[in-house]
Amino acid sequence: MELSYQEKVTLIKLRELKKASFDELVKETGLDQVAVMRAILWLQSKGLAKLHEKQKRVVKITELGEKYAKIGLPERRALKLLVEKGKVTLEDLREVLSEDELRPIIGILRKEGWATVRKEDDVLTLELTEKGKEALTKERPIDIALKVLAEKREVEAREIEELLSLKELKTRKIGEEDAKAEREVEITDEGLRIASEGLELKEEVSILTPELIKSGGWKNVEFKHFNIHAPVKRLYPGKKQPYRTFLDKIRRKLIEMGFIEMTVESLIETQFWNFDALFQPQNHPARDWTDTYQLKYPKYGFLPDETLVERVKASHEHGWITGSRGWGYKWDPRTAMLLMPRAHATALSARQLGKGVQIPGKYFAIQRVFRPDVLDRTHLIEFNQVDGFVVGETLTFKHLLGILKRFAVEIAGAKKVKFLPDYYPFTEPSVQMSAYHEELGWVEFGGAGVFREEMTKPLGIDVPVIAWGIGIDRLAMFKLGIDDIRYLFSYDLKWLREAKLVW
């Protein structure tokens, strides 16, 4: 059996001692602690030694305890002053005690029976008792415990508990309890056999230095063998939060594809941008409190410039110049002013189109949205969407399907994708995209479509616009290989450590 130099030295000592503490082995072998521990673990893995560990309760002296060991406990200093003067006031005690020490001192002196307390001319006075005189030369359990701690720095808890309760020591902040691992190493029968056969001690060299090469000394030394297949402890180096990394990669990918990221000013939108500018009628059920959140205070925001508002109003009421009949109701600007947390990132697309865009042009945003829902492994009430649109004169619905499929396959790593007809007030035709997840089955990613003219024309756009809003959290589930969407925002250290890096 191949053994390293450190293993041989440790095994030989164990043959002599049969059983030894870790500290004893360090002392006897002359090796450092790391080398001895490494040797013990290797010997144990080879069945030549056994490592026994048990937890031992210890008490360590605190910084305050060290201070009191030097200058004395507050009651001892107060007692010394009382013996000198016979009678003291609180002002007298301030000469030897801090304000923090002064507060409990009267109670301690009375409890110990060292002083009586009374008022003389409205001044609180402490007078020494006979018991107090005798106490100056007697040690209490707490005095002995402090002396032991000051001398040894660390003692077994049972040694202190024989004197007084640990609670008293900890309450006074003189000592603190801790757990300490006690290690003992024992040689096995196989270890005894190997050690008894005679082990040649030849120090090994683990590093080939320039000096060894120049001097030729490398010819006469034995180099340490490294087992590159040996099992080692798994390391968890620092890394970025997996989901955050995924979002950054998508952002970079879209920019590489020529998309421009939209500027986002706030998480709060007016209903105008969230619904009205998207040609969603004010009596639509999706605007109900069960499907969206509303701000209680402030309740109302501001509408954009009057010209744009009038166009949107006309589009809703009678279709404006689009050839549509609109929704045929009286549009209410007060409803459009209501504030709400953004319900979908498409509100950002409406804002961008209203500001003006390059034609042809491609735009995107990755933003947080909020919707009332039942939390489960595929639904959150606060989640991210990647919203985007492409504007150009020759764009068709087929271009949109191609972009969506590329998203699912290249970005999410989906193997199977399907499209189903859908309905949205602001797109026609509309489509829903789903992808197949091994654990969850078919998972809906989001919706898409061609923006209706009733939406785009009031915003000043006269060419086709294809658009989509995709639940990026669900894309991340595919890419990160998880089956519960809540893990994306989890503080679970095990998951954060073991989650794979994407791309």
UniProtKB/Swiss-Prot annotation:
One Pfam family named in its UniProt record: tRNA-synt_2d
Protein's cellular compartments: Cytoplasm
Entry keyword set: Aminoacyl-tRNA synthetase, ATP-binding, Cytoplasm, Ligase, Magnesium, Metal-binding, Nucleotide-binding, Protein biosynthesis
Manner of cofactor binding, per the entry note: Binds 2 magnesium ions per tetramer.
Cofactor(s) annotated in UniProt: Mg(2+)
GO cellular component: cytoplasm
Catalytic reactions on record: tRNA(Phe) + L-phenylalanine + ATP = L-phenylalanyl-tRNA(Phe) + AMP + diphosphate + H(+)
Annotated positions binding L-phenylalanine: 346, 385-387, 426, 451
Binding-site residues, Mg(2+): 428
One GO molecular-function entry: ATP binding
Disulphide bonds in the chain: none
Biological process per Gene Ontology, one example term: phenylalanyl-tRNA aminoacylation
EC number(s) reported in the record: 6.1.1.20
Keyword Oxidoreductase listed: no
Subunit structure as annotated in this protein's UniProt entry: Tetramer of two alpha and two beta subunits.
Family as reported in the entry's similarity comment: Belongs to the class-II aminoacyl-tRNA synthetase family. Phe-tRNA synthetase alpha subunit type 2 subfamily.
PANTHER family membership: PHENYLALANINE--TRNA LIGASE ALPHA SUBUNIT, PHENYLALANYL-TRNA SYNTHETASE
Listed name of the protein: Phenylalanine--tRNA ligase alpha subunit
Biological source species: Thermococcus sibiricus (strain DSM 12597 / MM 739)
Lineage: Archaea, Methanobacteriati, Methanobacteriota, Thermococci, Thermococcales
